[in-house]
C-alpha cells in the first residue's frame, strides 16, 4: 500500500463542509512530495482561514462525528419511511447521502425526473445520468431537514 499509492480523504460530507475543498492525503513521503509538486502548478490551495477551520474541526472530530451521524441517520430514516409510506420499495443506505428509488411506472429515468421537477417541484437525479445500470431509478439526496421528506415523498407519488 503506502509505498505504491495515495489515500485521499475529504471533510465534505463527514463534517458538512462541502464546497470548502478541504481534505488530506496519506502516503509515503516520496509520493506526498510528488503530489505537492503537481499541486503547486495547479492551485495554491484553499483560503488559509478555511484551512484553520478544517484543522479545528479535526481537533474536535469525535463528538461532532457522533452528533452528525445521529443527525444523518434520523434524516435517512425519515426519508425511507416517507417514501415507503407512498409505495416505494427501497433499502436504506448504510452510508450514502442518497436514496435510490425504482420508478414503478417503467418510465425512463430522465423523463420521470424532469416531469417530477416540472409538475411537483422536487429535484431528483435520473439514475441513467450515473451510468446504464441507473436506468429505471432516480436518486434523491438526503439534504432536507427530516420533517420535509413526507411532503417530498407525497409530491413524487403524485407524479406516478
Task: Say what each PLM segment does.
Residues 1-160:
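PLP-dependent class I/II
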Amino acid at each position: 500500500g503506502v509505498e505504491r499509492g495515495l489515500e485521499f480523504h475529504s471533510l465534505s460530507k463527514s463534517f458538512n463542509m462541502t464546497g470548502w475543498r478541504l481534505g488530506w492525503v496519506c502516503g509515503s513521503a516520496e509520493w506526498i512530495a510528488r503530489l505537492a509538486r503537481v499541486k503547486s502548478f495547479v492551485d495554491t490551495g484553499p483560503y488559509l482561514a478555511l484551512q484553520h477551520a478544517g484543522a479545528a474541526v479535526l481537533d474536535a472530530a469525535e463528538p461532532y462525528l457522533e452528533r452528525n451521524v445521529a443527525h444523518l441517520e434520523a434524516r435517512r430514516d425519515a426519508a425511507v419511511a416517507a417514501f415507503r409510506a407512498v409505495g416505494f420499495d427501497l433499502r436504506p443506505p448504510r452510508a450514502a447521502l442518497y436514496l435510490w428509488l425504482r420508478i414503478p411506472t417503467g418510465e425512463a429515468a430522465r423523463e420521470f425526473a424532469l416531469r417530477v421537477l416540472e409538475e411537483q417541484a422536487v429535484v431528483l437525479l435520473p439514475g441513467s445520468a450515473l451510468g446504464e445500470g441507473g436506468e429505471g431509478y432516480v436518486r434523491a439526496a438526503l439534504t432536507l431537514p427530516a420533517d420535509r421528506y413526507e411532503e417530498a415523498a407525497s409530491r413524487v407519488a403524485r407524479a406516478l
